[in-house]
C-alpha cells in the first residue's frame, strides 16, 4: 500500500479512500476502530438533533449532507485537498460524486474544478466524501457554485479531439462552462 500513488472512491467507498489518503497506510488499521465500529448513523442523528444544528437545518443553504461533512471532518483531521497535495508519501485522492443535473459523475479533481472556475485546494475532504456518499432522500444533495465565465476555459473543451469518449467528455465539460 505504500506504493499507491492514487486512490479513488465513490459513495461509501469514498469514506475509506479519503481516510487512506489523509492518514496513509500506517494508520489504516485504525480505520475499523475509528469509523467501522462506531454507530455512525446514530451519532449523525444525535448530532443533527442538537439545537444549533436544528436551526442550521432550517436554512436553505445548509442541508443534512453538510452535517455529514461536519461529522466526517474529525475523521480526516479537517484536511482540505490542498493539505493532501502538500503531503509527501500519501496518495492523491479522487472522489467521484453524481452531478444530479447531468446524471453523470463529477470528479473532485483539479481538472473538473477548473471547468467551473473554482479552487479544489480549499475544499474540505469531508465535503467531497459527503457529496459522494449522499443518498437521495436520506441526505440532501451537495451544491457547488459554478463560476464559469469568470476564468479562461481549459483547453480540454476545444474542438481538436475526435474520438467518441473524448467527444462525450468534451460535451460534459462544456456543460459546466454555463454557470446558469
Question: What do the predicted segments below correspond to?
Answer:
Residues 3-6, 80-90, 140-142:
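Surface-exposed patches in mature extracellular/periplasmic domains of secreted proteins
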Residues 1-62, 66, 110-112, 117, ...:
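Patatin-like phospholipase
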Residues 19-23, 70, 144-146:
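Residue-level detector of alpha-helical segments with a strong bias toward transmembrane helices
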Residues 53-85, 89:
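Long, well-ordered early-domain segments
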Residues 34, 71, 75, 128, ...:
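Residues that form generic nucleotide/phosphate-binding pockets
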Residues 88-180:
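Active-site gating loop/helix substructures
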Amino acid at each position: 500500500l505504500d506504493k499507491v500513488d492514487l486512490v479513488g472512491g465513490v459513495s461509501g467507498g469514498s469514506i475509506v479512500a479519503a481516510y487512506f489518503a489523509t492518514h496513509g497506510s500506517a494508520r489504516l488499521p485504525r480505520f475499523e476502530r475509528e469509523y467501522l465500529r462506531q454507530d455512525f448513523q446514530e451519532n449523525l442523528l444525535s448530532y443533527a438533533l442538537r439545537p444549533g444544528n436544528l436551526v442550521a437545518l432550517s436554512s436553505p443553504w445548509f442541508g443534512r449532507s453538510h452535517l455529514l461533512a461536519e461529522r466526517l471532518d474529525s475523521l480526516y483531521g479537517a484536511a482540505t485537498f490542498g493539505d493532501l497535495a502538500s503531503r509527501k508519501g500519501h496518495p492523491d485522492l479522487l472522489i467521484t460524486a453524481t452531478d444530479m443535473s447531468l446524471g453523470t459523475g463529477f470528479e473532485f479533481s483539479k481538472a473538473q474544478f477548473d471547468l467551473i472556475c473554482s479552487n479544489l485546494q480549499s475544499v474540505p475532504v469531508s465535503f467531497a466524501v459527503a457529496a459522494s456518499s449522499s443518498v437521495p432522500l436520506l441526505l440532501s444533495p451537495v451544491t457547488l457554485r459554478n463560476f464559469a465565465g469568470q476564468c479562461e476555459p481549459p483547453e480540454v473543451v476545444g474542438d481538436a479531439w475526435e474520438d467518441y469518449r473524448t467527444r462525450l467528455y468534451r460535451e460534459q465539460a462544456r456543460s459546466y462552462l454555463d454557470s446558469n
